[in-house]
Design a protein with these regions (language model features):
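Subset of outer-membrane beta-barrel
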Residues: 1-189
C-alpha cells in the first residue's frame, strides 16, 4: 500500500519598499514586531498507596497572535556626509491565550480565554555621518532616537465550564464574561 501527499505553503513574513529620489529617500512597509505561538499540554497522574491511578489532571496552554507594524519613512541628504531621517509607525495586532484545566474524575473542567487587541503609534528620528579616512577606510557614525510610546491594549476575558470529549475536543457548557481593564503597554525610548 502506498500513500501520496502533496503540500504547498506560501507565506509573506514582511514587505518593505525603499525609493531613492535624488537627495530624498522614502520607505514604507509592513514588518512583524512580535509573535506569540505556543501549545503546551501536560497530564499529571494522581495515585493511591498501591500506585493505582485515581485520576488524571489535564492541563493545556495555547497562545497565538502577535503585533505588526506598518511604517512610512523619510530620509534627506543634508550634505555629502550627513543624512537625516525619520519614520512613523502604526503598531497593531491581537494576542489570544487559553488555559484549560480538567480532572478525569470530575464531569467538567474550566478554561480561561484572554484576548488583547493592541494598537499604538510611535516614531524614530536619526542622523548619519560618513566620510573617507583614506583610500581603504571609511568612518561611519549614526545617532538614533525613539521617544517612549505606548500600545493601547483592549482586553477581554471569559471563564468557561467545559467538557473534554473523547476526541480531545472541548465542548463549552457555560461561559461567563469577566470585566478586565484596558491597559497601556509602555515601549521604552
Amino acid at each position: 500500500e502506498t500513500q501520496e501527499a502533496k503540500a504547498r505553503r506560501t507565506s509573506l513574513d514582511y514587505m518593505v519598499v525603499g525609493i531613492p529620489v535624488g537627495k530624498v529617500g522614502i520607505g514604507f512597509g509592513l514588518i512583524p514586531y512580535s509573535s506569540v505561538g505556543y501549545k503546551i499540554g501536560r497530564t499529571a497522574y494522581v495515585t493511591n498507596n498501591n500506585n493505582d491511578t485515581i485520576r488524571s489532571i489535564i492541563s493545556r496552554y495555547n497562545g497565538i497572535g502577535g503585533v505588526n507594524k506598518v511604517f512610512l519613512g523619510f530620509g534627506y541628504r543634508l550634505t555629502k556626509n550627513i543624512n537625516i531621517g525619520g519614520d512613523l509607525q502604526y503598531n497593531f495586532g491581537t494576542i489570544e491565550t487559553k488555559s484549560l484545566q480538567y480532572q478525569t474524575d470530575l464531569q467538567y473542567g474550566s478554561r480561561e480565554n484572554n484576548v488583547s487587541d493592541l494598537r499604538g503609534v510611535n516614531f524614530d528620528l536619526g542622523i548619519t555621518y560618513q566620510t573617507k579616512v583614506n583610500s581603504k577606510y571609511s568612518f561611519f557614525s549614526s545617532l538614533a532616537y525613539t521617544p517612549e510610546a505606548a500600545l493601547n491594549s483592549g482586553n477581554t476575558r471569559n471563564i468557561e465550564i467545559v467538557q473534554l470529549l473523547s476526541t480531545s475536543a472541548v465542548s463549552v457548557i457555560e461561559r461567563q464574561n469577566i470585566s478586565v481593564e484596558d491597559t497601556k503597554i509602555k515601549l521604552p525610548s
